[in-house]
Amino acid sequence: MTTILPNLPVGQKVGIAFSGGLDTSAALLWMRNKGAIPYAYTANLGQPDEDDYDAIPRRAMEYGAENARLIDCRAQLVAEGIAALQAGAFHVSTAGITYFNTTPIGRAVTGTMLVAAMKEDGVNIWGDGSTYKGNDIERFYRYGLLTNPDLKIYKPWLDQLFIDELGGRAEMSEYMRQAGFDYKMSAEKAYSTDSNMLGATHEAKDLEQLNSGIRIVKPIMGVAFWRDDVAVKAEEVSVRFEEGQPVALNGVEYADPVELMLEANRIGGRHGLGMSDQIENRIIEAKSRGIYEAPGLALLFIAYERLVTGIHNEDTIEQYRESGRKLGRLLYQGRWFDPQAIMLRETAQRWVARAVTGEVTLELRRGNDYSLLNTESPNLTYAPERLSMEKVENAPFTPADRIGQLTMRNLDITDTRDKLFTYVKTGLLASSGGAALPQLKDAKK
């Protein structure tokens, strides 16, 4: 039985994730005028481009909401963001520059906390502004039904009557004006922006074209570091972790993780740290392009990974990275609270993050240009005397020890050489001729 309602449920309570923008404002007013009973829910995610959160519910009431609530999601957002960082739950990257899954993290928090608030109010129908081509329609669908199994979904943007009457921004603006609300469309940007405290996403419109890039973007969390007229001074920064939790920046301790994240954003933002341009695969397997900001998470992640590599052994780090990529993809798909994701996340938090205690000092310059200056931790397994090129007393191993170790390697070297000549016999490799080893066949010869 479908949980998606194709038409407006007249006479019933309908919760709408209300941003206060033109789309959700017009949708709320339209639903009220058509006979539904709209309830507005606004998530305070610490969006850097929002000035007055308290005004948003008031506007919703003016537009016809039966009730309007502002839900403070900031603490939960930061908690989930740090959990993602601890697990390295980031699978999209280009040449080592990471997208920190800030939108998927935000959707996990919004989708659960808003639906939980609706459930408290006896509202079991939910609508939001996600379109059928994007990732969010599936993320919100999953998180909503996980939170409230009785939930039904109504999306104005999937209702043909709504589309026919209010199919574009011009029509929505005129609809608001005729209803007595002086709602003027904001100037159209060359791209759309979605943000929360962890990061910002810029995409669509001109950014759909790959010959249009970061230079048309106006950052909202930091500086346009690529511009010559923007002054960016080098800055020395220290980040301290205790058992996987970031606790101090530049020697200042923060009891509130939200305040720490805000300060990390300010520090990283002064340099444009954490901006990236990514081509990614959406949930439906079509490729999209986005330009991202995440100055605070980027700063914390640099320090965290430095400590991880100095504390853990190679096999643990390999498992952390492989599991992190898998977990990042699950997060991206809206599966952050699925059992397989919880298993990967809890493992990383317990066996990787809990050992991460220490302080990293780095110098930030422009964009993602930085240098590591110092790494300190009581848990470091890095011991320079083990491999020092100088003569040391009580050396952990001797030349004779290494001779023995290399001699043992003869076993697998012999096996490998025999296997290569086995491949010659099967025709997979060409005979060596004048070369010391068999060669890959040249199909042109």
UniProtKB/Swiss-Prot annotation:
State the reactions this protein catalyses.
L-citrulline + L-aspartate + ATP = 2-(N(omega)-L-arginino)succinate + AMP + diphosphate + H(+)
Sorted alphabetically, which InterPro entries does this protein's record hold?
Arg_succ_synth_type2_subfam, Arginosuc_syn_C, Arginosuc_syn_N, Arginosuc_synth, Arginosuc_synth_CS, Arginosuc_synth_type_1_subfam, AS_cat/multimer_dom_body, AS_multimer_C_tail
Example GO BP: L-arginine biosynthetic process
For this UniProt record, give its keywords in alphabetical order, as a comma-separated list: Amino-acid biosynthesis, Arginine biosynthesis, ATP-binding, Cytoplasm, Ligase, Nucleotide-binding
- Name the pathway: Amino-acid biosynthesis; L-arginine biosynthesis; L-arginine from L-ornithine and carbamoyl phosphate: step 2/3
Please tell me where L-citrulline binds in this chain. 99, 135, 139, 192, 201, 203, 280
Q: Which residues form a coiled coil?
A: none
User: What is the recorded name of this protein?
Assistant: Argininosuccinate synthase
Q: What is the lineage of its organism?
A: Bacteria, Pseudomonadati, Pseudomonadota, Betaproteobacteria, Burkholderiales
Encoding gene (name): argG
